[in-house]
């Protein structure tokens, strides 16, 4: 499989034909999974319809990536609304194989630095967002599809080399 990242930064240039061409290539390469990268956007329904029809499993990230967020009340409400809206829209697709909370945010704690001033508060905010808010909101719309908090993730147990799905830099220190 591979990550799907936006094929154009101008959304109006993305047509069903471009989506079909890209996914036809994935099928021709014998991919069986496409991961919707959390630094992009949620694709149009034609993307998921194609995956349903052609046997591609979708790993669906929520659109949180490569950052650390302070959990304000407004963000809390937005997270719940975004989760419910997208789960409600996508849950019926046979291709939907996995929900993932974010891209590389958990690993940011150990490898990117710069969080020392507020690290305890921000770490708790992270855990609240991806170990509590999203899974709870998701259950109300899709209680069947598996949820994983981050890619990579150790389930909130930062720095545990025996409990995460690793990327190359997670075990270098």
For the regions a language model picked out, list residue spans one by one.
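Active-site-adjacent substrate/metal-binding segments within catalytic domains
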Residues: 1-67, 76-98
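Conserved small/polar residues in nucleotide/adenosyl-binding loops
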Residues: 170-173
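Short acidic, gly/pro-rich beta-turn/loop elements at beta-sheet edges
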Residues: 12, 109, 157
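Solvent-exposed loop/turn segments at secondary-structure junctions
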Residues: 40-42, 64-66, 103-107, 154-155
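Short Asp/Glu-rich motifs
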Residues: 45-47, 69-71, 157-159
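Active-site neighborhood of glycoside hydrolase catalytic domains
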Residues: 72, 76-85, 89-153
């Amino acid at each position: 499989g591979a990550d799907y990242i936006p094929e154009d930064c101008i959304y109006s240039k993305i047509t069903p034909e471009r989506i079909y061409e890209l996914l036809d290539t994935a099928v021709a390469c014998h991919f069986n999974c496409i991961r919707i990268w959390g630094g992009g956007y949620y694709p149009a329904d034609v993307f998921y319809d194609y995956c349903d029809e052609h046997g591609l499993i979708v790993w669906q990230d929520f659109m949180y990536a490569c950052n650390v967020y302070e959990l304000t009340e407004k963000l809390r409400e937005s997270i719940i609304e975004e989760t419910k809206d997208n789960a409600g829209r996508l849950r019926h697709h046979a291709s939907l194989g996995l929900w993932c909370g974010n891209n590389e945010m958990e690993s940011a704690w150990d490898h990117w630095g710069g969080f020392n001033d507020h690290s305890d508060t921000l770490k708790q905010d992270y855990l609240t967002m991806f170990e509590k808010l999203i899974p709870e909101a998701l259950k109300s719309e899709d209680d069947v599809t598996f949820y994983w908090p981050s890619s990579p993730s150790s389930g909130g147990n930062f720095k545990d080399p025996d409990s995460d799905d690793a990327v190359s830099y997670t075990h270098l220190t």
